[in-house]
Design a protein with these regions (language model features):
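N-terminal secretory signal peptides
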Residues: 1-17, 21-41
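C-terminal segment of N-terminal export signals and the immediately downstream linker at the start
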Residues: 11, 33-65
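Solvent-exposed, acidic/polar segments of extracytosolic/periplasmic ligand-binding ectodomains
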Residues: 45-48, 373-425
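Beta-alpha junction/loop-to-helix N-cap segments that form part of ligand/metal-binding clefts
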Residues: 50, 76-83, 95-165, 233-240, ...
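An alpha-beta-alpha
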Residues: 70, 171-235, 254, 331, ...
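Extracellular/periplasmic bilobed ligand-binding domains
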Residues: 212-307
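Extracellular/periplasmic periplasmic-binding protein-like sensory domains
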Residues: 271-344, 355-360, 408-425
Length: 425
């Protein structure tokens, strides 16, 4: 399969095939199953066979990059990703590292500014010569750095659920794409709530706009239902009373919200202040994880639904071990959202892929990626598809007053990623 950089003009059949039969969950710890550990320790990787040309790799150390916003409006969402990636790196190093080398990381701040992301990505790849980068949150930041990764042949592990319509040799997308989140979530809410009318909201940049474009097409063309309104707000916006009044007048069955970052705090507080009870008014979000609720306050969003692939409350051995380790490293009061968990997958998937390839070489890592599976994933189990997205389950949760989600729905099996669904471009 060609991994030229594809955009929305590439079509592939719309599929939501389910992977039948998933591997058993690891019940031991959040490290990969013991078989993985034994296999890694048993293999020998002579330096001569480890292609490190042009990369910051020595016989004892390999350097990677971490690139997220820890300042600005996106810090509320991205801080957890940094914490998860550092936890994974610490655990991998405790296990012996990657190809016998300990991981060193260089962290850069994207500062919630897309040109800054591109500048920092170039620094990491050209000056620091990192072997991979774990980074970005918004699609705007990913779009800003993608030409840099393709020009300088770097490897990005991108953790956020996103709109799809993209594929690159130089990116592993560890979050969900549109068919796994937007379409699956709309199907669930229509069936479960008998919804007939929707009001679409979003922050004003590529991910919410493209996602709502996909949502509108699905609502109108597939479900044969009605969109009553669609509005967007600049990142960092704090005034939502006008649109809240419009929604109170139009009375949609479902508010579909893709508001991002710190704006969520103002939106949900103002929604509650306006008397909108989310236990009575159905609201579905694909952008509010436990990380955002930590700032919003559980009492301001209780009753809302979120369609994700991970919630901190998931009851499986891998997740319990992950949550315990996360709290031990970052404090008992820290919360873990969907993107935080997907960010945690990045270093582990990179380690497993590098060891499959027997090399840090970017082209070899890209070629070895399809089929790599991580049975120790907190969400349960993931596997890299040939399109560089992940097979994963889709889940719906309902927000509680304590800032966690109750799991109310999950697919029986993994959903196949289809970043170019026919009819949605």
């Amino acid at each position: 399969m060609s991994f030229e950089h594809h955009t929305g003009d590439l079509e592939s059949p719309f599929r939501r095939k389910l992977l039948l039969g998933t591997a058993a969950l690891s019940a031991a710890s959040l490290l990969p199953p013991q078989a993985f550990v034994q296999q890694a320790l048993a293999q020998q990787f002579p330096t001569a066979k480890v292609s490190t040309t042009g990369l910051a790799v020595t016989d004892s150390e390999v350097t990677v990059g971490i690139l997220h916003s820890v300042t600005g409006t996106m810090a509320i969402s991205e801080t957890g990703s940094v914490e998860a990636e550092k936890l994974a790196i610490e655990q991998i190093n405790a296990q012996g590292g990657v190809l016998g080398r300990k991981i060193k990381f260089i962290q850069e701040d994207g500062a919630s500014d897309w040109p800054t992301f591109a500048e920092k990505a170039k620094k990491l790849l050209v000056n620091d010569k990192v072997a991979s980068v774990m980074g970005c949150w918004t699609s705007a930041s990913r779009k800003a750095v993608l030409p840099v990764f393709e020009q300088y042949n770097g490897m990005l592990y991108y953790p956020t659920f996103y709109e799809g319509l993209e594929q690159s040799k130089n990116v592993i997308y560890t979050g969900q794409e549109a068919t796994q989140q937007i379409i699956a979530g709309l199907d669930w809410v229509q069936k479960t709530k008998a919804a007939k009318t929707f009001y679409l909201l979003g922050s004003d940049y590529i991910w919410p706009r493209t996602s709502n474009k996909i949502a509108r097409k699905h609502i109108e063309n597939v479900l044969k239902l009605k969109v009553l309104g669609e509005e967007y707000f600049p990142l960092g916006s704090t005034q939502f009373n006008s649109v809240i009044n419009k929604m109170k007048l139009s009375k949609p069955d479902v508010i579909y919200a893709i508001i991002v970052g710190g704006s969520n705090v103002a939106f949900y507080k103002q929604l509650k202040a306006a008397g909108v009870d989310l236990n009575k008014q159905t609201l579905m979000t694909i952008s509010v994880t436990e990380d955002e609720i930590d700032g919003i306050g559980g009492e301001n969003i209780v009753g809302a639904y979120a369609c994700m692939k991970y919630f901190q409350s998931l009851d499986n051995p891998n997740n319990k071990a992950f949550v315990s380790a996360f709290h031990k490293m970052w404090g008992d009061k820290t919360v873990i959202g969907d993107v935080t968990q997907a960010a945690y997958l990045g270093p582990w998937l990179w380690k497993l892929t590098v060891e499959k390839a027997g090399s840090f070489d970017i082209d070899k890592v890209a070629a070895a990626s399809p089929g790599v599976e991580f049975k120790g994933a907190p969400e349960g189990y993931v596997r890299i598809h040939e399109n560089h997205h992940l097979w994963s389950k889709t889940r719906v949760g309902r927000a509680r007053t304590d800032g966690q989600y109750d799991l109310v729905y999950e697919t029986a099996n993994l959903m196949e990623p289809d970043p170019f669904p026919k009819g949605y471009q």
